[in-house]
UniProtKB/Swiss-Prot annotation:
Main location: cytoplasm
Family from the record: Belongs to the class-I aminoacyl-tRNA synthetase family. Glutamate--tRNA ligase type 1 subfamily.
Taxonomic classification: Bacteria, Pseudomonadati, Pseudomonadota, Gammaproteobacteria, Legionellales
Organism: Coxiella burnetii (strain CbuG_Q212) (Coxiella burnetii (strain Q212))
The protein's name in its UniProt record: Glutamate--tRNA ligase 1
EC number: 6.1.1.17
């Protein structure tokens, strides 16, 4: 059975990069009729918080990325919080030590820092110098008796090559002499990502690992651990990272926001999944797709090796497409029942068909509810100046035209054209701004049908002031 996984650390809120990794793993599993697993990697005791843990799970559920195995689901391979798996890791540490494939390291952080500095100054890549690699049993006991707490290092074999096939990047080769012995247990007894991540993937039956390319150099180390313990090895695929438009790491200055913030601002889950699924993955269809359709079209071979550039406008495009396809009940659940309650029942259908194609967020709906049923709205400085420059006569003639022709916009515009000898923008724009406060938006003729006649009169009179 094919099984992919998403294993976030609960040290912060979920961001777009996390969400895309989760989505790709979900789509990959669904495309193969496989299992999507969630594991919480909370070994960083100081930074891991339960609020972040629950928030990550809430965000995944909101995105409809339901896991079949993990917290609150099938827990047959659990526990799925690494903080509860230390006894498992300790057992494998013991196996490695007994096989002389791991050894205690008493080097201080200062010693390691100095060693790296010397290596860099000599033009060599920084790696562990092997200071504690050959300590005798007596030397080890002496250091422990002195109260020194050792870390545990994996003994990397000399003069070998670690080779693996990456589904995105092809064959990868790493010289073990460039890796150096690495820490698999900290001096305080806790397990670093490198070790427990690999152990858990093997024990939980993960067959495929899709993760960011920043983990590429971790893979040979994890392969060495799994091979030493004779544990199954997953297939790896390292995906390109998301960057800003300028090619630098994605950040808030590029307009990137966390999933919770996007949700709170009215973004819809299907908009995010349609955007993220195409961020570094090619789809032939440019239509809004369901999660099932996205999964059907997902192919690891369609993942790009090049960094995926974040584009806020593209995200907003998919948001608008998603809003436009919402069933009416879902639309009002998203926009808010308090807005729906402000619309007279006899005008609800016309309002929805008129406004829906022109809104992207609940705040947009609120704006047009106020335009159609509110008393006043604030104009921007440039709009106020345009109305003043248009002159009172325009609005006086418009006032009279509405009295004469009612809500027939074509007749009103023809009247203005005849009386004022106007055409194009000068003919239409002042009327739209005076009545709606916006230069663009839904079809004006339909908005006028929705508005009360008194509202139209009042706004034309205000434009004369």
């Amino acid at each position: 059975m094919m099984k992919s996984r998403f294993c976030p650390s609960p040290t912060g809120l979920m961001h777009l990069g996390n969400a895309r990794t989760a989505l790709f793993n979900y789509l990959f599993a669904k495309s193969k009729d496989g299992i999507f697993l969630l594991r919480i990697e909370d070994t960083d005791v100081e930074r891991s918080k339960e609020t972040f843990d629950l928030g990550l799970q809430e965000d995944l559920r909101w995105l409809n990325l339901e896991w079949q195995e993990g917290p609150g689901a099938d827990e047959g391979n659990g526990p799925y919080h690494q903080s509860k798996r230390q006894a498992i890791y300790d057992d494998y540490y013991q196996r490695l030590e007994e096989a002389d494939q791991a050894y205690p390291c008493f080097c201080s952080e200062e010693q390691l820092r100095l060693s790296r500095k010397i290596q860099r100054s000599a033009g060599k890549p920084p790696r562990y110098a092997g200071t504690c690699r050959s300590l005798s049993a007596a030397e080890i006991e002496k250091k422990k008796a002195e109260g020194l707490q050792p870390a545990l290092r994996f003994r990397v074999p000399d003069d070998e090559v670690v080779v693996f096939a990456d589904l995105v990047r092809g064959e990868q080769r790493f010289q073990t002499n460039d890796i150096g012995d690495f820490i698999i247990r900290r001096a305080n007894g806790t397990s670093p990502f490198m070790f427990c991540n690999a152990i858990d993937d093997a024990l939980m039956g993960v067959s495929h690992v899709l993760r960011g390319e920043d983990h590429l150099t971790n893979t040979p180390r994890q392969l060495l651990i799994l091979q030493a313990l004779e544990l199954p090895v997953p297939t790896y695929a390292h995906i390109a990272l998301i960057v800003g438009p300028d090619g630098s790491p994605l950040s808030k200055r590029h307009g990137s926001r966390g999933i919770k913030e996007l949700r709170d601002n009215g973004y819809l889950p299907l908009a995010l999944t349609n955007y993220l699924a195409r961020l570094g993955h090619y789809y032939a269809s440019d239509e809004l797709l369901s999660l099932a359709e996205l999964a059907k079209g997902f192919n690891v071979e369609s993942l790009s090796k090049s960094p995926a550039k974040f584009n806020a406008q593209q995200l907003d495009y998919w948001q608008k497409q998603t809003v436009n396809q919402l069933p009416n009940d879902d639309f009002w659940e998203w926009a808010g029942s308090e807005l729906q309650s402000q619309i007279p029942t006899d005008k609800a259908d016309l309002f929805l068909t008129t406004v829906k194609p022109n809104v992207s967020f609940p705040r947009d709906v609120a704006y047009w509810v106020n335009v159609c049923f509110g008393k006043t709205f604030n104009l921007e400085t440039a709009q106020s100046e345009l109305l003043r420059a248009t002159g009172n006569r325009y609005f006086e003639e418009a006032f009279e035209a509405f009295k004469k022709f009612g809500k027939d916009l074509n007749s009103v515009v023809s009247h203005l054209k005849e009386k004022l000898n106007l055409k194009g923008k000068p003919l239409y724009q002042p009327l739209r701004i005076a009545l709606t406060g916006a230069e663009h938006g839904p079809e004006l003729a339909k908005l006028i049908l929705i508005m009360d006649y008194e509202t139209i009169q009042n706004r034309l009179q205000e434009a004369c002031q």
